[in-house]
């Protein structure tokens, strides 16, 4: 039987693009681990992706995961859009390169053999874990220490 894990994530950007951060909570049998990191120049979508990636990469064995995010971009991207992106060589329906492809590939790899249920929660609506992740992400964004090497400014 797989371990049942809950993950809650959020990303934040002070300006978009601008300094950003992510926050994540990983919960297993009443134990919690939090993750957060701030980046000097990034976007909100990149931080939403990073929150999910970091939490999933922290799992040491195959798990049954319920991952809650307030990002439709992440939830729809990983459950719907990614299949066609991969078929098209990481291009959109308009034959343009997929934005944030470095992180989409990393998230795809982080899924591994996990069984994941993706849950969308409304942001800033009083969901306790989402609010905590938002606080972690905002605090990290206010004190960025990392450079987002994959961020590419729009041409």
From Swiss-Prot:
One of its GO terms (molecular function) is magnesium ion binding. PROSITE patterns: RNASE_H_1. InterPro entries: RNase_H, RNaseH-like_sf, RNaseH_domain, RNaseH_sf, RNaseHI. Pfam families: RNase_H. It catalyses: Endonucleolytic cleavage to 5'-phosphomonoester. Its EC number is 3.1.26.4. It comes from the Bacteria. Keywords: Cytoplasm, Endonuclease, Hydrolase, Magnesium, Metal-binding, Nuclease. PANTHER family: RIBONUCLEASE H1 (PTHR10642:SF26). This is Ribonuclease H.
């Amino acid at each position: 039987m797989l371990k049942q894990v809950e993950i809650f994530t959020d990303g934040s950007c002070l300006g978009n693009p601008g300094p950003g951060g992510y926050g994540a909570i990983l919960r297993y049998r009443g134990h919690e681990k939090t993750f957060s990191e701030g980046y000097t120049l990034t976007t909100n979508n990149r931080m939403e992706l990073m929150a999910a990636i970091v939490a999933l990469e922290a799992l040491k064995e195959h798990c049954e995961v319920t991952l809650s995010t307030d990002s439709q971009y992440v939830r729809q991207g990983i459950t719907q859009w990614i299949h066609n992106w991969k078929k098209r060589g990481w291009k959109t329906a308009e034959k343009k390169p997929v934005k944030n492809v470095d992180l989409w590939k990393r998230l795809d790899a982080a899924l591994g053999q996990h069984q994941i249920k993706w849950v969308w929660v409304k942001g800033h609506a009083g969901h306790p874990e989402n609010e905590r992740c938002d606080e972690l992400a905002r605090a990290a964004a206010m004190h960025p220490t990392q450079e987002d090497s994959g961020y590419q400014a729009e041409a």
